[in-house]
Amino acid sequence: PPLGPIAPTAHDMRREHRVLVRLGDAFPLAPRSYALCTDPDILGVDFHVMERRRGIVIHRELPAGLAGRPELGRRVGEMIVDVLADLHQVDPATVGLGDLGRPEGFAERQLDGWGRRWHAAKDQAVPDVDRMLRWLEAAVPTPQVTALLHNDYKLDNLMVDPDDPATPVAVLD
């Protein structure tokens, strides 16, 4: 975990450990978490020890050996979407995570937050955004399906095969 001040719900090692333990075989890209330490005398923060996976994490640039392969971008992009869709297929209740989060009203809360952030940040009127927000608010599906979400899903929270970055090895964080 990062050391120093963090947002109250960010990097909750107890929650992360619990989720990784419960995902087990239901989502093979989740590394196993073997142990949780909550003793502040060890590192000063909670941490967990998880399975080592071998692969690379791509940040802003492809590693030198992978550059110059234009087909790679599309394959990696499709893989990112497929992996997230696979995670969403895991039923939280089936893996013992039915009590995680607050699924009721989730979409409404997200739209409300997006709208508030938009109105606080916009420096000019953009009618299309306001229209889109109204449309989304009117189109929230009912009933909503409960699914596991990764709150920081992005390329550098995926570990991929070093020889073929379109092959996922692990989902991190």
For the regions a language model picked out, list residue spans one by one.
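Catalytic-loop of the protein kinase fold
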Residues: 148-150, 155
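Hydrophobic residue at the +6 position relative to the catalytic HRD Asp in the kinase catalytic loop
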Residues: 158-160
